[in-house]
């Protein structure tokens, strides 16, 4: 959601803060601001809209001199996207400034208390209570004020705090919202995401819940909630900063679509040992598992839906999928014979973390599949498998989805061999089919030039329907999400067999229907649905294998993918749908990498 950065050192802080905020744009935001300490005074600049406007307002930071500062990109939760609601927020006496990512759940009670005590509020946000509490508790010791303030807060928060009276010092506080410290020489940093730090340092410390840090140019000291110092391991950030640049592509999304063969290979190759699969240090006693539950949000959830069929078929275990935002409030039948598989690109998705903790409380064993090393989900899981996708900057996930599928497919084969639920000869054929995945994804990507023509045909549609059965339906879910989130065209997915149970009433002349027809065992059933919608005037764009002549005779337009084993088809089927969504959005002039109202990492509920 929001992004925060901080710097203290020997350079002017504002340009560094602006650059860090630019690296956090992909998280989604509607306003931005920075605050800098100079000559025992705090200067603040805020704008609604893009960071480019903030850079222009401050002359790229030159109008805000000072070597200690904090910055923020806001995604509105409490209060409209206005300058008064933008961060940083300052105290009534102007001596303190705060940036915040998260939600203060008890802000209404705190606001009433502070108002009674004479504090004046300039904004509608939950964050402003924090800076007034700090002012109230400050008696010449910022550390003590921060501790007393944190003890009053309920909710999730990552805070950055500066004080005009202690101008070379920043306090950073974490509670259920990611916060990373960057270590330099004569300068130090913090940010809500490592992407804001790698241009300046590769040495990072990941704060845990309940910890806070005192940051000066020469020293970083970390404390627990009682104020005792904590020794932390320094992590080395290994990925190349060039991976977070566009590299000649017009958009990060297109770059990341094109990176999928490499990302899938990077995720797969270290885990394939000849004719065997080795899943890092995974040591689950699968013989004691009676059911598997997959939980996630958004595209990660749809990856779980697609992989469910492979895991269930190969492992002969019942597999359920449940949205994390629903699972956390349900009463699931979970015990110590349940394996919970948790998917999250960022490893910081708030609903997923909450659902995971609830299932752990009930005894479930937990396996995390995440992309960000050292993230919260990775740390609290019993086991973790990383998707080596590299940084994903575009808000709409692409390589994150396909690498999650890859790990799930690897797990399905690994578990099937351990459980002896698949014959050896069949297992070897499946392994060979999985090894071909990067090549087949590349072949699907080769259709990119032809997408422009289809985008010109379909970009003016008011709505689109995506249909399929079984795995094809799971892919339809993700395809519809891609279309709606970046092109702003209403797109819905339906199990093809459900069309006649209501949805077919919406089919009219010229209505685009994207039909997924890659599961040959049930293709004829989907063909009957194509005939039904065609009879009512729909324009059908079908995704199928090239040798499927029957589909060609029915569809108005075709998207071909290479032949692939049906258990693994989702990772290839999704490629043309990603490309179609990208080119439709481009035709419509949409902000492809940063769609309106969306955030890359949803760290609040």
Predicted regions and their residues:
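Acidic/histidine-rich
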Residues: 156-187, 454, 459-485, 520-522, ...
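Structural beta-sheet core signal
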Residues: 4, 36, 98, 161, ...
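Glycine-rich oxoanion-binding loops at beta->alpha junctions
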Residues: 67, 71-84, 267-284, 307-343, ...
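Glycine-rich phosphate-binding loops that contact phosphosugars or nucleotide phosphates
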Residues: 287-429, 433-436, 516-559, 580, ...
